[in-house]
Amino acid sequence: MASRFLAGLAALTLASAAFAGGPEQAGSLLVYPCYDNTRGMDTFITVTNTNLDVDNGTTKVEFVYIDGSNCLEFNRTRTLTPGDTLTVKSKTDNPNSTKGYVYVFAKNKTTGAASSFNHLIGTCRISNGGSGSDLEIQPFVYKAAGADGANTDADSDGIRDLNGAEYEQSADQLFIPRFVAQGPATSELIMINLTGGSKFTATVDLLIWNDNEEVFSSQYSFDCWEKKELSYISGAFTQSFLESTNHATGESMNGAETGL
């Protein structure tokens, strides 16, 4: 899979640039930012075929699980009939991996080749049995560039290229509209290196605004996939740092600083 990194807050759906893949559309490739098979956690991955054509609406889909620790992949292929919805439990579907991300792409129902089938939507639900909390995360959805039914692997390299020729490009900038200062709150950022996986280190440039439109910069480097607390990524996300800035004293959230 070739593109730039994706990043997303665990409790927030992110929209990409207008030309890039995003959550509010049907497409041929769905990227689910996180699955969690650790003790007490359950992840349910759903994909729906919105094509209702009884003659031409059937497609195969391949689930590709990417282990977050080493970027090794595990694959399963299913068939979706017109209007069909499939939900899998990642702990059962891929029991030998703890955490990571998964992508699902359409394949020709006869040849098994990756194909244009811009009718797939999905969602992911992560349940914490210990706390009783549920988290719903929407996948990043990418439309295929070719006509319906056309093979998408234009360069025959076996990789789902997010280059505009096979699938939509991915944005190189993402805006997260609000975060709550770490200390009073705990938030996590999911980062995926879609360009090279574990083959090289990806560096994310961060611009962090306080609630008075002051901006601070930071960087974070990672390999493959990471899900980290904001305070671990940069001290600029913490309550103590934001209180030390020229922040707007009347714009806190129940005493907690906020930012963009």
Where is each model-derived feature located?
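Gly/Pro-rich, tryptophan- and cysteine-flecked surface segments typical
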Residues: 19-260
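Sec-dependent, cleavable N-terminal signal peptides
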Residues: 1-22
